[in-house]
Amino acid sequence: MTTNTVRLHRVLRAPPARVCRAFLDADAIAKWLPPDGFTCKVHQLDAKIGGNYRMSFTNFSTGSGQGFGGTYRELVPGERIRYDDHFDDPRLPGEMTTTITFRTVSCGTELQIVQEGLPDVIPVEQCCLGWQESLVLLAKLVEPEIPD
């Protein structure tokens, strides 16, 4: 699928296991996934193949929210996560597929994200910007080495 697809690449100064865990832990997701100006609530997260998740983003300025959820289709810890998801709003139809790959590199983890099947009403560039904001927050979560 080449249209309605977002592709992202980032190198993080953290091991793949830690970066991967940030995609599978409800508290971590709520901290880093919402782009600027949004909050996130994770309602359900069963991180296993065939497991489901449900969450919502809320626009902090207006209070309006958007729910979405999906199913984990592939899960190889520290290497690859693939899930499908869909919005609750009928004006945002269809199913998206997101594939995240983690690869060990000399300074940490190379992260690649491909999100396919965006609804036509969501500009790919806007979605890409949102992901970029989220990935800045992800780096702030996973890169610090804080002793106990």
Q: Where are each of the predicted segments found?
A:
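Intrinsic-disorder/low-complexity, polar/charged segments enriched in Ser/Thr/Lys/Arg/Asp/Glu/Gln
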Residues: 3-9, 16, 40, 52, ...
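Beta-strand/loop substructures that line and gate deep hydrophobic ligand-binding cavities in soluble
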Residues: 82-133
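Hydrophobic pocket/interface hotspot
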Residues: 19, 29, 53, 72, ...
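Structural motif
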Residues: 13, 75-77, 105-107
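Generic structural detector for well-ordered beta-strands
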Residues: 7-13, 44-46, 56, 71, ...
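Hydrophobic ligand-binding cavity/cleft-lining segments
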Residues: 1-39
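Glycine-rich portal/gate segments that line the openings of hydrophobic small-molecule binding cavities
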Residues: 41-84
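Short, highly charged C-terminal tails/helix-capping segments
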Residues: 141-148
